Amino acid sequence: MPFTLGQRWISDTESELGLGTVVAVDARTVTLLFPSTGENRLYARSDSPVTRVMFNPGDTITSHDGWQMQVEEVKEENGLLTYIGTRLDTEESGVALREVFLDSKLVFSKPQDRLFAGQIDRMDRFALRYRARKYSSEQFRMPYSGLRGQRTSLIPHQLNIAHDVGRRHAPRVLLADEVGLGKTIEAGMILHQQLLSGAAERVLIIVPETLQHQWLVEMLRRFNLRFALFDDERYAEAQHDAYNPFDTEQLVICSLDFARRSKQRLEHLCEAEWDLLVVDEAHHLVWSEDAPSREYQAIEQLAEHVPGVLLLTATPEQLGMESHFARLRLLDPNRFHDFAQFVEEQKNYRPVADAVAMLLAGNKLSNDELNMLGEMIGEQDIEPLLQAANSDSEDAQSARQELVSMLMDRHGTSRVLFRNTRNGVKGFPKRELHTIKLPLPTQYQTAIKVSGIMGARKSAEDRARDMLYPERIYQEFEGDNATWWNFDPRVEWLMGYLTSHRSQKVLVICAKAATALQLEQVLREREGIRAAVFHEGMSIIERDRAAAWFAEEDTGAQVLLCSEIGSEGRNFQFASHMVMFDLPFNPDLLEQRIGRLDRIGQAHDIQIHVPYLEKTAQSVLVRWYHEGLDAFEHTCPTGRTIYDSVYNDLINYLASPDQTEGFDDLIKNCREQHEALKAQLEQGRDRLLEIHSNGGEKAQALAESIEEQDDDTNLIAFAMNLLDIIGINQDDRGDNMIVLTPSDHMLVPDFPGLSEDGITITFDREVALAREDAQFITWEHPLIRNGLDLILSGDTGSSTISLLKNKALPVGTLLVELIYVVEAQAPKQLQLNRFLPPTPVRMLLDKNGNNLAAQVEFETFNRQLNAVNRHTGSKLVNAVQQDVHAILQLGEAQIEKSARALIDAARNEADEKLSAELSRLEALRAVNPNIRDDELTAIESNRQQVMESLDQAGWRLDALRLIVVTHQ
């Protein structure tokens, strides 16, 4: 290998050193100085792992002074090169630059430059890069993108709402499903879609203080969305980092109280340029035309500044008409400005609901009914569709569905309001109550008496709360170490129940964390019962581990002991037995407890066991909940209303449980009120809205389609290959779970989403739902997305050499495999990937420019090839460099036709879809005022920008592989 002082070479094994200069040569060795790092390397002359850097006419090079030059001619004299060309900054021509003055920080980014500079990748990395390009492009084109990656059951009505709303520009909707139907999940799905597609980047979630942690957990566990929780302390800290503290995070959760307490804070929130605002428990925002509450005004102010708004609320019937109108007014104050007009409009929807019911019933329609439908829809050329719907043909059902969709598009608040009821959704279990009346121990009786004397000045509410938890009254006098569990009959009953039901998973809920911890100790020490604890003092990871231990079938915990707050947001539908060691103070909390098990997908009836002490507030409350509200065995939408109406009386009975006079009458009155309110709610149900929200067969098909995609084996093979190449250790744990841990030889020292301790993953949705410690891996999971980004944003796998052993071809035959990418640059919010994601075009060219890609499939061809080490590869490249240059030019001449075809197809699809959506909404705007002007403007603007971006689309060479035929 001829070396001359001043020549420039690059290391094949340490390309990060940059461009080296030959500074010493003797008979056996050569020394290179790498100026960009200041390091020297000594190599054997005969077999050194370095490649001569030689540029060609047309290349752009940089001098050590920083100016650039386009090479037009290359001269060699005494082994040293001089480049002649035109400077790009001054446009001076005929400039000469000797190679010794080349910039030492040279980085080869183009695949062909890397190949000619000896930066040759392993063959498996090239294959991974091509697969990453191919799968990434396919995923953008898959239907239901953004709906597949969440750790949730595939429940049709939830998917239907999320699919509809998640694709809109800046959606402003009211989610008003009944309790237990998953409003939080629906909101999370919508957020996930909007964030994944780029339609939104900044999200603010405002919730009651007690639900902050629940939302934090749900967003992270189900959707892999890491929100920051802002309270007074975090807000004060962030003020050091930015003028507006909320600019320090993209995804934020805070409480309603935190938002409204300070004028400056609310101003900062309004100025933070959020894309989406989510408000949970929005029915607590009190409004009247004359006196809106401060909370309502705070959200109203925010809703004016944030383009997208999701309000999660109780059902409209529970709210009452005026309160329901107030929520809609937050979404669109221009449309909902007059309450009286709104009431009148609602009455007019009855005939539409009747028409929809008539179509869904499937009966033949009379001429009058057909005419009425025609008038309601108000479309020209509707006659053939009406005739098809009324015929006996196979198309009748689909024609009726289309008519139903048209009716719902044109009438009612179905674009802004979604509401599902348990009546309309299948899959809920029964609930069976078992009450166990137990005697009040003398120790508690004494403590209660003393407490009554000493706490005479306490309010009735404080006394009532004390009376619910006699063990705490006892501890107040005897100290925290008082062993109340030695005589409390509930503990004896619980141990007996658990030992006689050892095969059952049992969820035990109590109000306080201390109670849960003490019970765990007693169960473990006395009976050897495996019990996990779950309370608010534990970190999210500790709670995950406890939940995972409880979920394990054979070796897991039999019991999970939860505190009230600690269990928020967690669901354990694999268990069906629940013990309430004490009772919560209001019906909402009771429903929240039962809701841990009473979910869609629960396979068994729920057994609710309530051991209670007689002559305590527990005995009062158990009767009131069961006999007055029927709140144990059925969901109780009336609970809060009745609770508020009898609050003072109920508190007095709880504070003095031995004073039972009149209590039977209270229960009777509550039951009558409950039945009357329930009938009223049932009567006020908006059937039209239910049909729209539920999604029917369309929603079912959506769930089935995603279920099919869950079985994609390509994902598993690709993910394992990706993790191998990144350098992540994989340990099969069984039960469809794999443990991933970082290694010492990773492509990057710190891979996003992989902690030092490692993570457990699964590709199985059912396993992920049962095991909260296992992350559910899909194409949408950050682990895969970060991996794709790591490979595709760098040059990993962009140039390689392979040998093809094939005696049918002459030795030394050259083939060049080219991977071009056709793409368009545009802001993420345009969601251009719907039409033209970065799309790979593969070409396999011989020296005559014949493209063999169609005849030779990638994976089949890849299996026939053998790898070449980098040093041998560099020698091969140097030997055939001119031939490869010629083939590359042939490739450049051919790619334009293929790329143009892709770009034209994308333009046609974008124009057709976006124009059709705009036309549809413009036509509907004439008959349905719930379509906002700003939505139409945004779609038109989006269409124009998308078309302009596609006009600017281009292509580039992303990767290449040189293939040399051998017979050995």
Swiss-Prot record:
A motif (DEAH box) lies at residues 280-283. It is an enzyme of class 3 (hydrolase). The keyword Iron does not apply. GO terms for molecular function: ATP binding; DNA binding; helicase activity; hydrolase activity, acting on acid anhydrides. Residues 164-334 form the Helicase ATP-binding domain. SUPFAM superfamilies: P-loop containing nucleoside triphosphate hydrolases (SSF52540). ATP binds at residues 177-184. Pfam families: Helicase_C, RapA_C, SNF2-rel_dom, Tudor_1_RapA, Tudor_RapA. Keywords: Activator, ATP-binding, DNA-binding, Helicase, Hydrolase, Nucleotide-binding, Transcription, Transcription regulation. Residues 490-662 form the Helicase C-terminal domain. CDD domains: DEXDc_RapA (cd18011), SF2_C_SNF (cd18793). One of its GO terms (biological process) is regulation of DNA-templated transcription. Its EC number is 3.6.4.-. Interacts with the RNAP. Has a higher affinity for the core RNAP than for the holoenzyme. Its ATPase activity is stimulated by binding to RNAP. Transcription regulator that activates transcription by stimulating RNA polymerase (RNAP) recycling in case of stress conditions such as supercoiled DNA or high salt concentrations. Probably acts by releasing the RNAP, when it is trapped or immobilized on tightly supercoiled DNA. Does not activate transcription on linear DNA. Probably not involved in DNA repair. Belongs to the SNF2/RAD54 helicase family. RapA subfamily. This is RNA polymerase-associated protein RapA. It comes from Shigella boydii serotype 18 (strain CDC 3083-94 / BS512). The lineage of its organism: Bacteria, Pseudomonadati, Pseudomonadota, Gammaproteobacteria, Enterobacterales.
